[in-house]
Amino acid sequence: MAIAESFRLEDGFSVYAGVRATRDAVVEDAAFAVAKLGGADGTDAAEKIVAALIRPDVSIIMLDGCIVSFYNWIDGEALYAKFQKPVACYVFEEPEGRVEEAVRKLFPDWPDRLRAIEKLGSPTPYYTKAGYKIYVRSWGIDPIYAGKAAELAMKLGKMPEPLRVARIMAAGARALLNTLGLRLVNGH
């Protein structure tokens, strides 16, 4: 299973898309949710998607980042505790080191937000056989095995195919909402 998001700051919300895929990355089902930009509901949005897609044969929940939606976040540990499936959060670019500075500057609730983000832990670098470097946080699975799981699902470049498809679907859903002129109230 894979969850990714798409947002534009002017929208005020982020669209999350999730896919359930087979081991060879064939997509079987999809689900969507929304979260507020700069909100604290990223984990809730991810939980809705997992609840809609979960089956006993799901072996891992892949996340396209944990710090999402303009400093919202997805708590991988909470997903692991709730669904009892390994969770891996991947970052495909060098993580930026200014999260703390930005959070302090932008959010009145910065102490709580920073605690939640710091609880995610530091990512572990993983090097693929093709020479890509990805960063992994994981719960219920060793980060190296989570990196191997990502590598096994890579078809085009360094992103696992289910995450790539989920990202495309999230962007498409966001574009559809904008094309239809739909505005979400309070991020929902």
Swiss-Prot record:
According to its UniProt record, what is one Pfam family this protein matches? DUF99
Matching entries from InterPro entries are given as:
Endo_dU
Q: Which Cys-Cys disulphide bridges does the record give?
A: none
| Family note | Belongs to the UPF0215 family.
List the HAMAP family hit by this protein, alphabetically.
Answer: UPF0215
Q: Which PANTHER family match?
A: UPF0215 PROTEIN MJ1150
Protein's UniProt name:
UPF0215 protein Pars_0148
Q: Which organism does this sequence originate in? A: Pyrobaculum arsenaticum (strain DSM 13514 / JCM 11321 / PZ6)
